[in-house]
């Protein structure tokens, strides 16, 4: 195993962890060392070492990035990459270190380190999780934080691609000033000849609990591409903020060259405590030869001022089969509420058409508008896809339900 990196003082960068040793025989690769801690005022954590390669065993896991806490700036170290394996499974990527700042009156910036990528092998290694970013909560100041991105899953030769790592959590709890927090993006799923890896979930963003602040959830990672079955897209992260919140977008499903596309990830929910909440859009389904992946559902939006649901993801197209169905729009809740529109059905030339997504419902203390449904896909000799239903609307003064969509045509079958 690799040794740990050294620590740094004051304005400093921690040393990187050493790489794990390679194994030429039956054994597994060595584990990468952890990174060293950064300085007290400005802290940059050291990166984790890479895992060692293996021949018939499992690649070594990547070392973890170091946590970094500085007075004004903290940047977590990135996780080490997992080791590859020629005839075994790839090693897992190391987790990114957290980054934080603790200045009582200045500008606090905390950035989480990225997770390490998984190693390649017969089955791909999982990507490491991104590190958290945050601050201690300053007064009369500005808090900015970013969660680290999740590492990508490793590629697979004969099996399943590695799952993408989860994006890091971000928090900016400014008391009187302004805080903004952005969750880290999920890692990509690993590519494979069999089944592609699942994309990582986006990180949560939470900002300004007691002051003006916004929180934005991280986007979900894309599913891995594959020959047989594309990977599922990762879900978008939750966004929470006193002033406003926005959910992260769902990751797209992985494409498949000869099988079924992966489904799109669900959009992240959003909460604006006194402002607006906007749900994340659903991920697009993966394209394929036989069957397209379904689109992901849009996230819900909730806010005292207004809530807007995210749009559903479109279904993936299919070159010789049936396209994927569209995802449903997210619901909206608030003083004014609006439901998200449903996603379109994927194009295809199969016997039956894919269904269009339903519109999201809306609830508003003053007014509400339901989301529109999406049109159903056309068919050849079977049944056309159902048109999506319009979303319901409930408002004290004004309410408008969403429009329903047209059903799909059929050339020699039933519309």
Locations of the language-model features?
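Glycine-centric low-complexity repeats
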Residues: 1-415
């Amino acid at each position: 195993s690799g040794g740990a990196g050294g620590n740094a003082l004051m304005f400093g960068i921690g040393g990187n962890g050493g790489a794990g040793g390679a194994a030429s025989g039956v054994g597994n690769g060595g584990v990468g060392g952890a990174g060293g801690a950064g300085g007290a005022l400005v802290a940059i954590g050291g990166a984790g070492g890479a895992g060692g390669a293996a021949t018939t065993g499992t690649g070594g896991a990547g070392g973890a990035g170091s946590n970094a806490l500085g007075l004004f700036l903290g940047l977590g170290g990135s996780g080490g990459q997992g080791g590859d394996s020629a005839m075994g499974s790839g090693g897992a990527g190391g987790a990114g270190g957290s980054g934080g700042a603790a200045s009582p009156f200045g500008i606090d910036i905390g950035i989480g380190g990225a997770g390490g990528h998984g190693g390649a092998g017969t089955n791909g290694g999982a990507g490491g999780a991104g590190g958290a970013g945050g601050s201690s909560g300053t007064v009369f100041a500005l808090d900015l934080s970013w969660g680290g991105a999740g590492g990508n899953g490793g590629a697979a030769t004969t099996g399943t691609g590695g799952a993408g790592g989860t994006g890091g959590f971000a928090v900016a709890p400014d008391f009187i000033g302004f805080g903004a927090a952005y969750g880290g993006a999920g890692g990509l799923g690993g590519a494979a000849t069999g089944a592609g890896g699942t994309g990582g979930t986006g990180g949560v963003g939470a900002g300004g609990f007691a002051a003006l602040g916004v929180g934005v959830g991280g986007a979900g990672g894309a599913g891995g591409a594959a020959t047989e079955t594309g990977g599922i897209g990762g879900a978008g992260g939750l966004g929470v903020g006193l002033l406003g919140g926005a959910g992260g977008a769902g990751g797209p499903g992985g494409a498949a060259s000869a099988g079924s596309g992966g489904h799109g990830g669900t959009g992240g929910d959003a909460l604006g405590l006194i402002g607006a909440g906007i749900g994340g859009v659903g991920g697009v389904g993966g394209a394929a030869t036989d069957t397209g992946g379904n689109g992901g559902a849009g996230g819900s939006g909730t806010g005292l001022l207004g809530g807007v649901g995210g749009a559903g993801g479109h279904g993936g197209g299919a070159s010789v089969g049936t396209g994927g169905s569209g995802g449903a729009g997210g619901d909206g809740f608030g003083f004014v509420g609006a439901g998200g529109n449903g996603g379109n059905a994927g194009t295809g030339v199969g016997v039956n058409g894919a269904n269009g997504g339903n519109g999201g419902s809306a609830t508003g203390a003053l007014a509400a508008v339901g989301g529109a449904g999406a049109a159903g896909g056309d068919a050849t000799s079977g049944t056309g896809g159902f048109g999506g239903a319009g979303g319901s609307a409930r408002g004290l003064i004004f309410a408008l339900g969403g429009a329903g969509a047209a059903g799909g045509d059929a050339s020699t079958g039933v519309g």
